[in-house]
Amino acid sequence: MPNQIRAQLLELNKNTKSNNVKQQLEIIENINSNDSIELKDLADLFFERITGPNYKSNCVDGLIYEKLLNSKNQEIVKFASNLCPDGIVPLRSAQQMNYKDLQMLLTHRDLLKADQLTQQKLIQLAGVNAQTRNWLYFTDIKKIPAQDLQTIDKLWHTHSKGKFGLFVQRQIWLSVGKDWGKFWQKIGWEVDRIPCRYPEEFQWNSHGPRGHLPLFNQLRGVQVLSALFTHKAWENY
């Protein structure tokens, strides 16, 4: 492994609380997935990070975990799978909802299916009978437990290099003064004030604009998203 990258990894491990997340992500992105030595060093770093005292998962660890789990080195894949069989985000639910399937889709970067599954889970959490209605009313949102919204958000945020998730969308919405037109443009759901067509005009990868995913149907109005963004889940989050 080049000494420069090794030194960067060591520095990364020292600065786990650094605010320079972008630089940390770039270091990880530059690691050669076909180089077993580099992957082994990355695996060692991952072990040190997640077994440390007071560990809390973040998007840096999310990218490391994805890099290890999606490598072609079966020894590395087995190591990551055994170390974190349920992923690195605690899958907490007030309704005993199973989030392992969503975690796996996001880890393997199948964002279209992850988005569809997210909508299904929100409908289930709200107690809606999916056989009679497969969308949410704004009155359904308050029925969704805060803990579950936080888990869904953390999964999206952790496995998107910090770009996606409900809380990121909420931050953007607040930053544009709750102006929905500006919000749609900012997150790439509209282009030149024309709503994007589903699914072909949305970006199902990490190259989409910040806040691009998960999707909600803005053609049904803004009340559902407004209810989500003002949910008690984000108080002291």
Curated annotation (Swiss-Prot):
Q: What highest taxon heads this organism's lineage?
A: Eukaryota
GO CC annotation: chloroplast
Q: Tell me the lineage of the source organism.
A: Eukaryota, Rhodophyta, Bangiophyceae, Bangiales, Bangiaceae
Query: Chloroplast: is it a keyword of this entry?
Result: yes
Q: Which gene encodes it?
A: ycf53
Keyword match Plastid: yes
Q: List UniProt keywords, sorted A-Z.
A: Chloroplast, Plastid
Q: What is this protein called?
A: Uncharacterized protein ycf53
This entry's Gene Ontology molecular function terms read:
tetrapyrrole binding
Q: State the species of origin.
A: Pyropia yezoensis (Susabi-nori)
> Which protein family is it in?
Belongs to the ycf53 family.
Compartment(s) of residence:
Plastid, Chloroplast
**Main location as per UniProt:** plastid
InterPro entries per record:
GUN4-like (IPR008629), GUN4-like_sf (IPR037215)
UniProt xrefs under SUPFAM superfamilies: GUN4-like
